[in-house]
Amino acid sequence: MDGVWVATSRRYSTTSTVLLDGSGGAVVVDPAWDPDELAAIPRDLAALGVRCVAGLATHEHYDHVMWHPDLGPAERWSSAGTVAHLAVERDRLLEPLSSYLTPDLIDLAGRLSALPGEHLPWDGPPALCIEHDAHAPAHLALLVEEWGVLVSGDMLSDVELPMPADDDVTLERYVTGLERLRDAAASARWAIPGHGTPTSRPMERYDADMRYLDDLIAGRPSHDPRILDPEMAELHEANVRLAAAQASSG
Protein backbone atom coordinates (compact mmCIF):
# COMPACT_ATOMS: atom_id res chain seq x y z
CA MET A 1 0.00 0.00 0.00
CA ASP A 2 1.92 3.05 -1.22
CA GLY A 3 1.52 5.99 1.13
CA VAL A 4 0.17 3.84 3.97
CA TRP A 5 2.00 2.54 7.03
CA VAL A 6 0.47 0.30 9.69
CA ALA A 7 1.86 -0.50 13.14
CA THR A 8 0.37 -3.25 15.30
CA SER A 9 0.33 -3.02 19.09
CA ARG A 10 1.15 -5.87 21.42
CA ARG A 11 -2.32 -5.33 22.91
CA TYR A 12 -5.29 -6.88 21.12
CA SER A 13 -3.60 -6.58 17.70
CA THR A 14 -4.57 -2.91 17.71
CA THR A 15 -3.50 -1.04 14.59
CA SER A 16 -2.19 2.50 14.17
CA THR A 17 -2.41 3.72 10.58
CA VAL A 18 -0.36 6.48 8.97
CA LEU A 19 -1.39 8.06 5.66
CA LEU A 20 1.26 10.07 3.79
CA ASP A 21 -0.01 13.07 1.82
CA GLY A 22 2.92 13.12 -0.61
CA SER A 23 3.97 16.61 0.50
CA GLY A 24 5.86 15.73 3.66
CA GLY A 25 2.79 15.44 5.85
CA ALA A 26 1.22 12.47 7.60
CA VAL A 27 -2.21 11.80 9.08
CA VAL A 28 -2.15 9.43 12.05
CA VAL A 29 -5.30 7.36 12.53
CA ASP A 30 -6.07 5.79 15.92
CA PRO A 31 -2.52 5.81 17.39
CA ALA A 32 -2.10 3.14 20.09
CA TRP A 33 -1.36 1.75 22.64
CA ASP A 34 1.37 1.51 25.29
CA PRO A 35 3.57 4.56 25.96
CA ASP A 36 6.57 3.09 24.15
CA GLU A 37 4.41 2.22 21.15
CA LEU A 38 2.92 5.71 21.03
CA ALA A 39 6.41 7.23 21.26
CA ALA A 40 7.61 5.05 18.39
CA ILE A 41 5.12 6.59 15.95
CA PRO A 42 6.65 10.11 15.82
CA ARG A 43 10.12 8.57 15.72
CA ASP A 44 9.10 6.48 12.72
CA LEU A 45 7.62 9.55 11.04
CA ALA A 46 10.88 11.42 11.54
CA ALA A 47 12.78 8.49 10.04
CA LEU A 48 10.51 8.73 6.99
CA GLY A 49 11.21 12.45 6.74
CA VAL A 50 7.60 13.47 7.33
CA ARG A 51 5.70 15.22 10.11
CA CYS A 52 2.26 14.71 11.57
CA VAL A 53 -0.18 17.27 10.15
CA ALA A 54 -3.42 15.77 11.50
CA GLY A 55 -4.92 12.93 13.47
CA LEU A 56 -8.15 11.01 13.09
CA ALA A 57 -10.05 9.03 15.71
CA THR A 58 -12.48 6.58 14.14
CA HIS A 59 -14.65 6.42 17.25
CA GLU A 60 -14.94 7.29 20.92
CA HIS A 61 -13.50 4.17 22.56
CA TYR A 62 -10.46 4.77 24.74
CA ASP A 63 -8.11 2.65 22.61
CA HIS A 64 -8.79 4.84 19.56
CA VAL A 65 -8.40 8.37 20.95
CA MET A 66 -4.80 8.29 22.24
CA TRP A 67 -2.00 10.65 21.26
CA HIS A 68 1.64 11.42 21.96
CA PRO A 69 3.15 14.88 22.54
CA ASP A 70 5.91 14.27 20.00
CA LEU A 71 3.25 14.07 17.29
CA GLY A 72 2.82 17.78 17.88
CA PRO A 73 -0.22 20.06 18.12
CA ALA A 74 -1.87 18.88 14.91
CA GLU A 75 -5.65 19.02 14.65
CA ARG A 76 -7.18 15.71 15.64
CA TRP A 77 -10.42 15.04 13.85
CA SER A 78 -13.40 12.82 14.52
CA SER A 79 -17.13 12.84 13.89
CA ALA A 80 -19.24 15.54 15.50
CA GLY A 81 -21.08 12.86 17.47
CA THR A 82 -17.86 11.45 18.89
CA VAL A 83 -16.63 14.91 19.88
CA ALA A 84 -19.94 15.77 21.54
CA HIS A 85 -20.10 12.50 23.48
CA LEU A 86 -16.53 12.87 24.73
CA ALA A 87 -17.35 16.39 25.90
CA VAL A 88 -19.92 15.06 28.36
CA GLU A 89 -18.63 11.53 29.07
CA ARG A 90 -14.87 12.02 28.90
CA ASP A 91 -14.01 10.66 32.35
CA ARG A 92 -16.13 7.53 31.93
CA LEU A 93 -14.98 6.80 28.39
CA LEU A 94 -11.28 7.24 29.18
CA GLU A 95 -11.23 5.64 32.65
CA PRO A 96 -9.68 2.35 31.39
CA LEU A 97 -6.59 4.25 30.21
CA SER A 98 -5.45 4.60 33.82
CA SER A 99 -4.29 0.98 33.60
CA TYR A 100 -2.04 1.66 30.62
CA LEU A 101 -0.96 5.28 30.26
CA THR A 102 0.80 7.92 32.32
CA PRO A 103 -1.26 10.94 33.47
CA ASP A 104 0.21 13.22 30.80
CA LEU A 105 -0.80 10.83 28.03
CA ILE A 106 -4.27 10.39 29.52
CA ASP A 107 -4.66 14.16 29.50
CA LEU A 108 -3.90 14.22 25.77
CA ALA A 109 -6.40 11.47 24.96
CA GLY A 110 -9.70 12.41 23.39
CA ARG A 111 -8.83 16.04 22.57
CA LEU A 112 -10.70 16.00 19.28
CA SER A 113 -12.35 18.43 16.87
CA ALA A 114 -15.37 17.76 14.68
CA LEU A 115 -14.65 17.21 11.00
CA PRO A 116 -15.78 20.20 8.91
CA GLY A 117 -17.36 17.96 6.28
CA GLU A 118 -17.49 14.42 4.98
CA HIS A 119 -13.93 14.49 3.65
CA LEU A 120 -10.71 14.53 5.65
CA PRO A 121 -8.99 17.94 5.41
CA TRP A 122 -5.50 17.10 4.13
CA ASP A 123 -3.24 17.50 1.10
CA GLY A 124 -3.54 13.89 -0.04
CA PRO A 125 -6.14 12.43 -2.41
CA PRO A 126 -9.83 12.72 -1.44
CA ALA A 127 -10.53 10.72 1.70
CA LEU A 128 -14.21 10.10 2.41
CA CYS A 129 -15.34 9.72 6.02
CA ILE A 130 -18.21 7.24 6.21
CA GLU A 131 -20.26 7.59 9.40
CA HIS A 132 -22.44 4.88 10.91
CA ASP A 133 -23.60 3.64 14.32
CA ALA A 134 -22.30 0.08 14.32
CA HIS A 135 -19.91 -0.71 17.20
CA ALA A 136 -20.09 2.86 18.54
CA PRO A 137 -22.26 5.89 17.88
CA ALA A 138 -20.98 8.10 15.05
CA HIS A 139 -18.23 5.63 14.15
CA LEU A 140 -16.10 6.58 11.13
CA ALA A 141 -14.44 4.61 8.38
CA LEU A 142 -12.07 6.36 5.98
CA LEU A 143 -11.97 5.54 2.27
CA VAL A 144 -9.09 6.82 0.14
CA GLU A 145 -10.65 5.76 -3.13
CA GLU A 146 -7.68 6.67 -5.35
CA TRP A 147 -5.51 4.30 -3.33
CA GLY A 148 -8.20 1.67 -2.84
CA VAL A 149 -7.65 1.83 0.92
CA LEU A 150 -10.40 1.54 3.55
CA VAL A 151 -9.44 2.27 7.16
CA SER A 152 -12.40 0.61 8.83
CA GLY A 153 -11.99 1.29 12.54
CA ASP A 154 -13.42 -1.51 14.68
CA MET A 155 -15.12 -3.20 11.74
CA LEU A 156 -14.11 -5.92 9.24
CA SER A 157 -11.71 -7.65 11.62
CA ASP A 158 -10.27 -11.10 11.16
CA VAL A 159 -9.80 -11.58 14.91
CA GLU A 160 -12.88 -9.91 16.41
CA LEU A 161 -16.49 -10.87 15.89
CA PRO A 162 -18.93 -8.06 15.15
CA MET A 163 -19.15 -6.08 18.39
CA PRO A 164 -22.32 -3.99 18.76
CA ALA A 165 -22.41 -0.79 20.78
CA ASP A 166 -22.89 -1.13 24.52
CA ASP A 167 -26.44 0.21 24.40
CA ASP A 168 -27.65 -1.92 21.49
CA VAL A 169 -30.64 -4.11 22.37
CA THR A 170 -30.72 -5.97 19.03
CA LEU A 171 -28.30 -6.49 16.13
CA GLU A 172 -30.31 -4.20 13.87
CA ARG A 173 -28.16 -1.10 14.30
CA TYR A 174 -24.97 -3.08 13.70
CA VAL A 175 -26.33 -4.63 10.52
CA THR A 176 -27.40 -1.21 9.25
CA GLY A 177 -23.97 0.22 9.99
CA LEU A 178 -22.19 -2.67 8.34
CA GLU A 179 -24.34 -2.21 5.23
CA ARG A 180 -23.10 1.40 5.09
CA LEU A 181 -19.63 0.01 4.43
CA ARG A 182 -20.60 -2.36 1.65
CA ASP A 183 -19.85 -0.10 -1.30
CA ALA A 184 -16.57 1.04 0.25
CA ALA A 185 -15.50 -2.54 0.92
CA ALA A 186 -16.45 -3.52 -2.63
CA SER A 187 -14.39 -0.72 -4.16
CA ALA A 188 -11.35 -1.02 -1.87
CA ARG A 189 -8.29 -3.11 -2.60
CA TRP A 190 -7.23 -3.04 1.04
CA ALA A 191 -9.05 -2.81 4.36
CA ILE A 192 -7.25 -1.96 7.58
CA PRO A 193 -9.22 -2.94 10.71
CA GLY A 194 -8.68 -1.40 14.13
CA HIS A 195 -7.80 -4.85 15.49
CA GLY A 196 -6.30 -7.61 13.40
CA THR A 197 -4.50 -7.71 10.08
CA PRO A 198 -4.96 -5.66 6.91
CA THR A 199 -6.52 -7.59 4.06
CA SER A 200 -6.37 -7.41 0.28
CA ARG A 201 -9.85 -8.97 0.21
CA PRO A 202 -12.13 -6.47 1.97
CA MET A 203 -15.35 -8.04 0.69
CA GLU A 204 -14.42 -11.38 2.21
CA ARG A 205 -14.32 -9.64 5.60
CA TYR A 206 -17.63 -7.91 4.90
CA ASP A 207 -19.27 -11.15 3.78
CA ALA A 208 -17.95 -13.04 6.82
CA ASP A 209 -19.42 -10.46 9.20
CA MET A 210 -22.75 -10.33 7.40
CA ARG A 211 -22.98 -14.13 7.20
CA TYR A 212 -22.30 -14.38 10.94
CA LEU A 213 -25.00 -11.83 11.74
CA ASP A 214 -27.49 -13.39 9.32
CA ASP A 215 -26.98 -16.79 10.92
CA LEU A 216 -27.60 -15.45 14.41
CA ILE A 217 -30.67 -13.46 13.40
CA ALA A 218 -32.11 -16.53 11.63
CA GLY A 219 -31.45 -18.68 14.69
CA ARG A 220 -28.89 -20.80 12.87
CA PRO A 221 -25.58 -21.92 14.41
CA SER A 222 -22.66 -19.94 13.07
CA HIS A 223 -19.50 -21.68 11.93
CA ASP A 224 -17.42 -18.52 11.95
CA PRO A 225 -13.88 -19.54 13.01
CA ARG A 226 -13.56 -16.48 15.25
CA ILE A 227 -16.01 -18.12 17.65
CA LEU A 228 -13.31 -20.66 18.53
CA ASP A 229 -11.19 -17.94 20.13
CA PRO A 230 -11.85 -18.12 23.91
CA GLU A 231 -11.64 -14.34 24.08
CA MET A 232 -14.64 -14.13 21.74
CA ALA A 233 -16.89 -16.48 23.73
CA GLU A 234 -18.53 -13.80 25.86
CA LEU A 235 -19.09 -11.52 22.87
CA HIS A 236 -20.61 -14.35 20.84
CA GLU A 237 -23.01 -15.21 23.65
CA ALA A 238 -24.04 -11.57 23.91
CA ASN A 239 -24.63 -11.42 20.16
CA VAL A 240 -26.81 -14.53 20.34
CA ARG A 241 -28.92 -12.80 23.01
CA LEU A 242 -29.24 -9.65 20.88
CA ALA A 243 -30.31 -11.77 17.91
CA ALA A 244 -32.93 -13.52 20.03
CA ALA A 245 -34.23 -10.17 21.24
CA GLN A 246 -34.47 -8.99 17.65
CA ALA A 247 -36.38 -12.10 16.62
CA SER A 248 -38.82 -11.78 19.51
CA SER A 249 -39.49 -8.13 18.71
CA GLY A 250 -40.71 -9.15 15.29
Which residues does each predicted region cover?
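Active-site environment of divalent metal-dependent phosphoester hydrolases
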Residues: 34-36, 60-66, 83-86, 137-139, ...
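Catalytic core of the metallo-beta-lactamase
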Residues: 1-48, 52, 66, 106-176, ...
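Active-site HxH/HxHxD metal-binding segment of metal-dependent hydrolases
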Residues: 38-122, 215-218
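Residues at the C-termini of beta-strands that transition into short coil/loop
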Residues: 8-10, 80, 195
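Generic beta-sheet signal
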Residues: 77-79, 152-153, 194
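Short, solvent-exposed loop/turn segments at secondary-structure boundaries
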Residues: 90, 162-166, 203-205
